[in-house]
Amino acid sequence: MNDLLYFNGINASTGEYLTPPLRAEELAQLARGETIPPTQLLEFQWRKQQAQDHLGVKEGVDANDLAQAGWGVIFAHDADAALHDALRELLEHRKAQANQIKDRYREYTYRPGESKNLFLTRNGAGPGAVDPDKVPYYLLIVGDPERIPYSFQSELDVAYAVGRIHFDTNAEYAQYAQSVVRAERDDFSLAKRAAFFGVANPDDPNTQSSAERLVKPLAEKMSAQKNDWTFDSYLVKGATKSKLEGLLKNETPAFLFTASHGAGFEIGDARQFKQQGALICQDWDGPVAMKGKPIPQTMYYAMDDVTGDAHLHGLIAFHFACFGAGTPKYDEYSHLKANVRERFQIAPSSFVAKLPKKLLAHPKGGALAVIGHVDRAWGSSFLWNAAVEQLSTFESALTRVLNGSPIGAAMEYFNARYAELAVSLSSDLENLKLGKKVDAQQLANIWTANNDARGYVILGDPAVRLRVNGKTSHPPLERESLTLNIPSDAKLHVDKLDATLEKLENQISELAVTLKELRAAIKNSDS
């Protein structure tokens, strides 16, 4: 019997796993050194006790209504005023929504080294159910994880709906702000279509498991629940790079779920900042056939593959992949490697992955949000004890997303799971200190599941939601009537008429879209 635990993540420079497989007992030995601060444990215990329908807000507050739940933004202490100006369109839009009943819009500054508890205390709040009159429920972090750490984001996300944006230029911030506001203000809607993309590379237990036991059943469950949606599944041989290119270009759904390895690179590799977290597709022949061989970009989808003519506006994507959302400066799992006892540096600095940044700030209108993983993604997200499928967290969150809930509220299911696992892990560790026996397999499972649950983040405004109507993939077109005068004695070739009319209809539709885009461009230049 193979009792090895396999870890996600492929070293794209060597074609090998970033971390070799371990036995449960080896992993349990590592978990025994884990500690959870008492103040954080108290909040985890509170979060575990909360009923799911209350989400993170206090009783009587509708988390789907920004006028009740509130919205705030958190800038780094040294943020340039020009950054605020770049986001002005989004900030003014959210302020108008959050202040409809009471003043529930806030702008904050994060101080270096500040913990979540210190931040809340300084702003008049504390642990527990969110009171939007003190600190809004929806919070958007603006800045890179060196200035506002990932650890602060994950702590804050236990009770609040937190998202982050970080771009390289103010123009990209402005582009994202414009994309969100136009999706919510304009007559904008997408067809109710979702796509599920599941890679299963040869000789690779990780992706074979995620394709068969995460992507496939999740797509089936969603399809059974939402009969007014169209669900397309691309599994195994269908999960190629060319297919993903199509899904992120001219076949873009409203919601996209992918599961694959994320590409990892050694510190110092010139590709790390640009391509870490890129999605390795079915084109890769697996860790046996490709052992010792660098993975070429023809086998993975990176930021460079996002074309300028891609149609991404309104998309919400969920990438289950290592480093899919970002990379920390220090490896949280470096002690999984032989003879390593301390965390070591894996990147020059913590950073947000380039692929989702490119999707969010696309010049033709970007994605509204991308859900992904900071550091490694683990199979324990959907398998318990490596055998029992546990899809309820994914299923519940995706149901809320497809129902039109704000993405931050939908992800509360993941936050609740993290809190529950943290409490369980703390209990097991306490029993160990008291000399009680704890099963090694159980401890290993809880430890990996806890670390995995902590890593899910939202890139984008946590208050965005899908804009769908089920009828068309474009805003409704305003068409003038067209009259064709055909003499009654004209001789028509009926067998050619249908094809001719269809071609004419397509040309008229394309012209109408072009004219509408031109009107919008002229309007923007005038304003």
PLM regions: where:
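Short, low-complexity, charged amphipathic interaction modules
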Residues: L484-S527
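Catalytic-core segments of thiol-dependent peptidases
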Residues: H77-D78, R94-A98, A125-E146, L218-A353, ...
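Beta-sheet entry/capping signal
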Residues: W71-G72, Y137-L140, R193-A195, P253-F255, ...
